[in-house]
């Protein structure tokens, strides 16, 4: 029996930073979906959706320049789930010194977010023309130990996510951010690792549940 292949593209939150493969949201999603599905994790720690340069130097850590990005396209998946943007919502501020690294000041180039994200979408469409594509809205940034990551920057990207979705009516939204935000603040804080940026196993399970409900709304409703 041919399995439905789901390819998860993203950053460290997809990869499973700090928790290991079996606690990552793609792994937990595979458990929810069952044997008829194959879920492939192609997340890369620190990656940005934007692929930019400044004075000939690469800014951030562009996902499209990573080997796992090329592997994700080569998978020819039936479904692609893209969860990027957390690392684009940063200003490059040093954690100790009063200094901003311009090569990490991604939010200063936020007006280029849409075109760069669209390039990823177009590459997926070219690699897998019949695939369904889902865009995830990233989880909130809590009181992050790294000063450069701030929720207000993620909020600045929200209109751009809306613009991307409006320009691509065939793409569906998975609102991970809303899934966290609708909980009480204490409950939300309990879903993160100590760094305030990366969800812990419980938070990653919430992401998996949210993705599952988007992919399989009927089955999820029956389980509820």
Predicted feature descriptions by range:
Residues 128-132:
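A short helix->loop->beta-strand "cap" motif at the edges of active sites that frequently abuts
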Residues 9-10, 136:
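Short hydrophobic segments within beta-strands
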Residues 3-7, 13-111, 115:
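Conserved SGNH/GDSL esterase-like catalytic core that processes O-acyl groups on lipids
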Residues 48-51, 89-94, 143-145, 181-188:
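Short acidic/His/Gly/Ser-rich catalytic and metal-binding motifs that mark active-site loops
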Residues 69, 117-122, 158, 162:
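Generic structural signal for well-ordered alpha-helices
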Residues 139-178:
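Substrate-gating cap/lid alpha-helix
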Residues 69-88, 168-194, 204, 211:
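N-terminal hydrophobic signal/anchor transmembrane helix of membrane proteins
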């Amino acid at each position: 029996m041919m399995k439905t292949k789901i390819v998860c593209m993203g950053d460290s939150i997809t990869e499973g930073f700090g928790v290991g493969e079996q606690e990552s949201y793609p792994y937990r999603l595979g458990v929810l979906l069952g044997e008829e599905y194959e879920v492939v994790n192609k997340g890369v720690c620190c990656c940005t959706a934007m692929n930019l340069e400044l004075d000939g130097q690469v800014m951030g850590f562009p996902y499209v320049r990573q080997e796992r990005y090329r592997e994700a396209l080569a998978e020819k998946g039936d479904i692609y789930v893209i969860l990027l943007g957390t690392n684009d919502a940063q200003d490059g501020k040093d954690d100790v010194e009063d200094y901003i690294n311009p090569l990490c000041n991604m939010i200063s180039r936020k007006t280029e977010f849409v075109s760069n994200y669209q390039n990823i979408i177009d590459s997926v469409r070219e690699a897998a023309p019949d695939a369904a594509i889902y865009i995830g809205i990233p989880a909130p940034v809590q009181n992050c130990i790294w000063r450069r990551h701030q929720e207000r920057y993620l909020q600045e990207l929200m209109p751009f996510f809306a613009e991307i979705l409006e320009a691509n009516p065939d793409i569906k939204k998975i609102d991970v951010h809303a899934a966290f935000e609708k909980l009480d603040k204490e409950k939300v804080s309990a879903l993160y690792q100590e760094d305030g940026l990366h969800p812990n196993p419980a938070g990653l399970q919430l992401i998996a549940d949210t993705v599952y409900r988007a992919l399989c709304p009927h089955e999820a409703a029956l389980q509820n």
